[in-house]
Regions:
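Catalytic core of pol beta-like nucleotidyltransferases
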Residues: 1-30, 38-44, 54-101
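Conserved histidines in hydrophobic membrane contexts and catalytic metal-binding motifs
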Residues: 33
């Protein structure tokens, strides 16, 4: 994958565009970004940290979401399913930083 030339607003626009399709196909109830991109501190080698909430967690669906967004954004996407059992440190970061669409 190439350098990330997308900024926070670009990525949020892509997520908004994909939200209804992901909800219908994969049961996504919420999604957003966190990490350096959400904080406005992303560099050209930064990945996209994506948080999703789903009706029924499904690893197969998460892989599809990841691959579709990597193709569209042309950069690496790390995806986290947000749930009660999410690592406490990661959950706190997401709670503080996440920008949902």
């Amino acid at each position: 994958m190439g350098e990330n030339t997308l900024n926070r607003d670009d990525v949020l626009a892509i997520l908004r565009k994909k939200k209804a399709d992901f909800a219908k196909a994969y049961g996504v109830t919420a999604m957003g970004i966190f990490g350096s991109l959400a904080r406005g501190q992303a560099k050209t080698d930064s990945d996209i940290d994506l948080v999703v909430k789903m009706k029924k967690p499904d690893l197969f669906y998460m892989v599809h979401i990841k691959e579709e967004l990597e193709s569209e954004c042309r950069t690496r996407v790390d995806i986290v399913h947000y749930r009660e059992k999410t690592n406490a440190f990661l959950k706190k970061r997401i709670d503080q930083e996440a920008v949902y669409v």
